[in-house]
Amino acid sequence: MNIFFLFFSFLPAAVSLFLQVAAGAVWQIFIKEGLVKNTQGSVLFYHMIGLCVFGYWYFAVQGTGLKETAKKIKETGKNCSILTVIGIFVLGMLLCVLGNSMVGVEKYLFPSLVEQYQRMMENAGMGTSALTVFASVAVAPIGEELLCRGVTLHYTKKITPSFHIANFFQALIFGLVHFNIIQGLYAFVIGLFLGCVREKYNSLLPAMFLHFAVNASSLFLLGGLLNRIPDTPVSWAVCFVLSLAASVILLIIDKRPLFERTKIK
């Protein structure tokens, strides 16, 4: 195991933590000076900064420019069928159910931690503020994929020749960058799938779309359905097992990559 790249694998997460703290502090200064009134705008502020920082970092480690990136986007669009797009979106919905099922089970195992998590989400205005909705659905999928499946996975792949071990490390770091246990646990599991999608299609774009589908499903599509699930440990455990099994099956159905790895790295 390459200890040098193991250190670099955690460096993006440390930078993310610094940016979150710095963005929150700067936003408080904006509020104090009367420049802004909405305290929830700090979430979008952080994600916009992170998008710039990790976007530049990703292009730096990949050695690609805007021209090559545009070429890759065009190639992805050409080779991505409508069934692939639908499949990724359905996978996102399944992962949304999986994540909520994990929280449902954890509510009975770690009630105080789940209560703290729910209070934190409410204070952040998740699902209620237009700024946080835009940040979590439109901006976060891009920035967090650049951070974890872009920069971090680039370094974890240098630790070991095994993709599965490298994917485990990047998913672990993806869980850690959420900086709370409850969200970190389901982020870890979802991060495993995001890493597999990025590797399968040899592109960050499908992973970004999957991330968008997960977040959009959580906020807009599945709220009513999830509220109808009986609030018992057994019900949530069954939902977890079924959604996990369906997600794995859906992930492995289409074995065709979007394009040959020898053409575009």
Regions found by a protein language model. Give the residues of each.
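Membrane-interface capping segments at transmembrane-helix boundaries
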Residues: 60-67, 251-265
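Membrane-interface helix/loop boundary segments of multi-pass membrane proteins
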Residues: 143-169, 196-203
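Hydrophobic core of alpha-helical transmembrane segments in multi-pass integral membrane proteins
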Residues: 13-20, 48-58, 89-98, 237-257
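Functionally important transmembrane alpha-helices
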Residues: 17-25, 183-239
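Juxtamembrane helix-loop-helix connectors linking adjacent transmembrane helices
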Residues: 33-39, 70-143, 154, 158, ...
